[in-house]
Design a protein with these regions (language model features):
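Active-site environment of non-heme Fe oxygenases that use a 2-His-1-carboxylate facial triad
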Residues: 2-4, 13-214
Length: 214
């Protein structure tokens, strides 16, 4: 399972559009859930106003361990090479410095990196406000099983996120979610500025092709 998120919102650089094409749907499960963040932030402003303003005012920092090589089978399997478009540690370190990251190299070749402060809530050019982040995914599934989600995400000032409010936000997002039940040959275009997406659990072979547009 991959939890709801805006693609690469845990980085300073992210795509504007996502294109999906179903080559082969899973035997069971495997839907792509989508949730409009403008609708979500409207609900959150009504039910959790202090949480929304904290995300907007303080921003968010993410900490994530990236493998040396891509792992397509994992929702968190994007390597540091792919993330930073670097072929070497030295190149990666240069790119991280440009983007404001701090990081530690691990003995297995993986990289544990912490982002600069990134937005939790954005105002789009058309006036809409969106819950633009990877908060739900980071809190629900970035770290290893059993690890506190506080290791994966915090407010920009280092303060822990209020767990009760995070889980309430997750619940509201799920209420607003629509599942794309894939059929062979089906295509979907997602506006990454407005819409979060994820992946439901599945069994069997599932081939959904994806392309990211800057």
């Amino acid at each position: 399972r991959i939890y709801l998120h805006h693609e690469m919102a845990q980085t300073p650089v992210f795509p504007s559009k996502l294109f999906f094409f179903c080559e082969q749907p899973a035997e069971s499960g495997g839907a792509t859930p989508i949730c409009r963040s403008d609708c979500l932030v409207a609900r959150l402003e009504h039910e959790l106003p202090s949480f929304v303003e904290a995300c907007a005012g303080k921003g968010l920092r993410y900490t994530h361990t990236m493998p040396a090589d891509d792992d397509p089978g994992s929702g968190m399997g994007r390597s540091w090479r792919s993330t930073f478009r670097a072929d070497s540690r030295a190149g990666c370190e240069v790119r991280m410095a440009e983007l404001g990251y701090s990081a530690v190299w691990n003995s297995d070749g993986s990289l544990t990196a912490t982002t600069p402060v990134l937005s939790g809530v954005k105002n789009l050019e058309d006036g809409r406000r969106v819950f633009f982040n990877q908060l739900i995914a980071a809190y629900s599934g970035f770290g290893p099983a059993g690890e506190s989600p506080d290791h994966s995400i915090a407010f920009g000032d280092g303060e822990k996120l209020p767990a009760d409010m995070v889980w309430k936000a997750c619940q509201i997002a799920e209420e607003l979610t629509f599942d794309i039940q894939w059929q062979t040959g089906q295509m979907a275009i997602v506006d990454n500025h407005v819409t979060m997406h994820g992946r439901r659990r599945f069994s069997g072979v599932r081939k959904i092709l994806a392309a990211l547009i800057a």
